[in-house]
């Protein structure tokens, strides 16, 4: 498919700073997925990963963020985002042909690594493919990974709890860690248990069926674009709805955090639930 807007050098340099949800967020997504996958999917993943522990997905959830900084993994830097050329907060929207750069993006990466797992689950590329899928589905659910403005907010300086950082970083790391109460693997497990309970019997239980609407293992691009479009809407409705002047002049650890917490927690929950559904579909296909 055509790629009309290759990633500029400046944008790529800033994008290299991104870490998806940060370690805590990615591990939380993975633990949530572990709570919902079928037992056969658990065995499928554990076999590929060579890990039968109770953290088999969480243990690899952040691998892609480390790998992209190696010589071997530098090619994968664009796979963590799609640069929506929209106009927040006035209008938001993601278009695959317009926004997926010539070097690829999160959406094309999901297509590629899903197909590897479908076609060669016992092949030499399956290990990294699974690790990429676990990570990138998490990335897609962070709104600023579906946004071009200032390299997904990396170029927007903000103050959070008295410290200078950038908008992308507080969505990746500061706010989820504050909500969870830390950033260790054990904290991620506890946070995942909280969000999993909301999915099963709590706040999200009436919504969860709609979270997998449109899912189609035969069309990874359309499926992951549904998820990217969903997350991107929050760039207009929550992330930047008050405008840049407010973002630049206000400590965002107060009212901004309060309005954002329900959004990022539900997105993390969606990511884990959808990851489980996607892995179930992969594992159930005849290879």
Curated annotation (Swiss-Prot):
Residues 135-183 are annotated as: Substrate binding. Coiled coil: none annotated. The lineage of its organism: Eukaryota, Fungi, Dikarya, Ascomycota, Pezizomycotina. The keyword Hydrolase applies. Gene3D superfamilies: P1 Nuclease. It comes from Aspergillus oryzae (strain ATCC 42149 / RIB 40) (Yellow koji mold). Monomer. The keyword Cell division does not apply. Binds 3 divalent metal cations. Hydrolyzes only single-stranded DNA and RNA without apparent specificity for bases. One of its GO terms (biological process) is DNA catabolic process. SUPFAM superfamilies: Phospholipase C/P1 nuclease (SSF48537). Disulfide bonds join 92-236, 100-105. This is Nuclease S1.
């Amino acid at each position: 498919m055509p790629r009309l807007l290759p990633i500029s050098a400046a944008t790529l340099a800033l994008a290299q700073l991104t870490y998806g949800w940060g370690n805590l967020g990615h591990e939380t997504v993975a633990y949530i997925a572990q709570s919902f996958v079928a037992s056969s999917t658990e065995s499928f993943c554990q076999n590929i990963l060579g890990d039968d522990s109770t953290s088999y997905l969480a243990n690899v959830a952040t691998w892609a963020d480390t790998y992209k900084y190696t010589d071997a993994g530098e090619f994968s830097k664009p796979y963590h985002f799609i640069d929506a050329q929209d106009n927040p907060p006035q209008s938001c929207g993601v278009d695959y042909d317009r926004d997926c750069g010539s070097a690829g993006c999160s959406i094309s990466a999901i297509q590629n690594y899903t197909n590897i797992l479908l076609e060669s689950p016992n092949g030499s590329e399956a290990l990294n493919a699974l690790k990429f899928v676990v990570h990138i589905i998490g990335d897609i659910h962070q709104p600023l990974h579906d946004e071009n403005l200032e390299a997904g907010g990396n170029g927007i300086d903000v103050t959070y709890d008295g410290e200078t950082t950038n908008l992308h970083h507080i969505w990746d790391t500061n706010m989820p860690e504050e909500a969870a109460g830390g950033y260790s693997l054990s904290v991620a497990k506890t946070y995942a248990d909280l969000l999993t309970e909301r999915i099963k019997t709590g706040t999200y239980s009436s919504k969860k069926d709609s979270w997998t609407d449109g899912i189609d293992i035969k069309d990874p691009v359309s499926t992951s674009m549904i998820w990217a479009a969903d997350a991107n809407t929050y760039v207009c409705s929550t992330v930047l709805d008050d405008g840049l002047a407010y973002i630049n002049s206000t400590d965002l650890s107060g009212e901004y955090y309060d309005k954002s917490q329900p959004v990022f927690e539900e997105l993390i929950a969606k990511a884990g639930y959808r990851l489980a559904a996607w892995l179930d579909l992969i594992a159930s296909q005849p290879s």
